[in-house]
């Protein structure tokens, strides 16, 4: 089994990102490996997942943990962003109480970004913090949501407004789990991969440009997929290590997310999934950067073409409420002193942050995205 370990050397809780095809079978032994774990984990493990993911991978994960000597239980939540609520967290708490989970116990998130965010927040807050492990099964979660310790749930007024920074003990990425991922969800993850190419890793962007097909797993050569996963995870680890709690640099990881979150909110989290909204946010951010003379038209067009090639949306619906965007943007977590901070590219592989974006520039960018 080919294995890659990427360290995330945070001072309070360093951990490893393990990338390995077939790695689910090694989860139990890696959690017992003291070279990977700074503390000895307790026997009780609760795996949180959703029914679809559990059907495919639950038995493998449960067997791996049991064979390593853990006492394993599982708890299933419905799939989807609409269930990422405090009510779902309460259900995890209730089950944790039934199982008498202790501070040495471990919550394992087996699933996509929604499951990871909720499980992490439950781990951060149950008994003021218990062990937490990420086992992402979607591309988006593998390259973004599972790394860096952001956890939380949505509030009716905005996305991820309730949350905490809480680092996992291990992130296990098994590319084989992408075989059962819906094509639309694969494309959603590719939006985050494209983001890393724009903000951090020009070579990754060029690798993606060189791929004939970036829109489906089955068209992605295994060595290219491994390179994409490794480069994306390394980019996220590099940024998080320098700025764990988003005091400065880490904000660049929100490229495409400022307007993307507003699009998700204004369309009721139903029309676009998270990755699609991020893609639309990147299109808008590129237009804003060009209008402000921060970015060249040529580079913006390269990004646009890559997003289109990947099968991600670049247009908004004709009835999209542009006039409501300003109010939603003010609930964004990056707002500082009442000003919305935008992450904008200056060249491929480089990014900057500004709170000096005139409202008419934002409106112009969004109007240009309204579909025919």
Curated annotation (Swiss-Prot):
One of its GO terms (cellular component) is cytoplasm. Zn(2+) binds at residues 192, 257, 274. It is an enzyme of class 4 (lyase). InterPro entries: Dehydroquinate_synthase, DHQ_synth_AroB, DHQ_synth_fam, DHQS/DOIS_N, DHQS_C. It is found in: Cytoplasm. Keywords: Amino-acid biosynthesis, Aromatic amino acid biosynthesis, Cobalt, Cytoplasm, Lyase, Metal-binding, NAD, Nucleotide-binding, Zinc. This is 3-dehydroquinate synthase. The gene is aroB.
């Amino acid at each position: 089994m080919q294995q890659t370990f990427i360290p995330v050397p945070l001072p309070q809780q360093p951990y490893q990102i393990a990338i390995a095809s077939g790695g689910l079978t090694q989860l139990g032994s890696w959690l017992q490996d003291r070279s990977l774990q700074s503390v000895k984990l307790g026997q009780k493990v609760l795996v949180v997942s959703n029914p679809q993911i559990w059907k495919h991978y639950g038995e493998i994960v449960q067997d791996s943990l049991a064979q390593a000597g853990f006492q394993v239980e599982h708890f299933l939540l419905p799939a989807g962003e609409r269930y990422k609520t405090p009510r779902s967290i309460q259900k995890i708490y209730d089950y944790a109480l039934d199982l008498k989970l202790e501070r040495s116990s471990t919550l394992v998130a087996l699933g996509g970004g929604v499951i990871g965010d909720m499980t992490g927040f439950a781990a951060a807050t149950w008994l003021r913090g218990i062990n937490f492990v990420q086992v992402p099964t979607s591309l988006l979660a593998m390259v973004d949501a599972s790394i860096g310790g952001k956890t939380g749930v949505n509030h009716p007024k905005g996305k991820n407004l309730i949350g905490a920074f809480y680092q996992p003990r291990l992130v296990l990425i098994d590319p084989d789990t992408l075989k059962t991922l819906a094509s639309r969800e694969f494309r959603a993850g590719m939006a985050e991969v494209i983001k890393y190419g724009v903000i951090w890793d020009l070579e990754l962007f060029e690798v993606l440009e060189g791929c004939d097909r970036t829109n489906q797993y089955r068209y992605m050569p295994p060595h290219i997929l491994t390179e994409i996963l490794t480069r994306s995870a390394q980019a996220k680890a590099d940024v998080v290590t320098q700025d764990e709690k988003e005091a400065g640099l880490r904000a660049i990881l929100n490229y495409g997310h400022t307007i993307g979150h507003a699009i998700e909110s204004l369309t009721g989290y139903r029309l676009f999934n998270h990755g699609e909204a991020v893609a639309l946010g990147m299109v808008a951010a590129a237009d804003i950067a060009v209008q402000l003379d921060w970015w060249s038209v040529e580079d913006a067009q390269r990004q646009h073409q890559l997003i289109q090639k990947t099968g991600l949306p670049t247009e908004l619906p004709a009835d999209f409420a542009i006039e409501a965007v300003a109010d939603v943007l003010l609930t964004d977590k990056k707002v500082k002193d009442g000003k919305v901070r935008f992450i904008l590219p200056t060249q491929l592989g480089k990014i900057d942050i500004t709170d000096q974006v005139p409202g008419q520039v934002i409106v112009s960018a969004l109007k240009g995205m309204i579909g025919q």
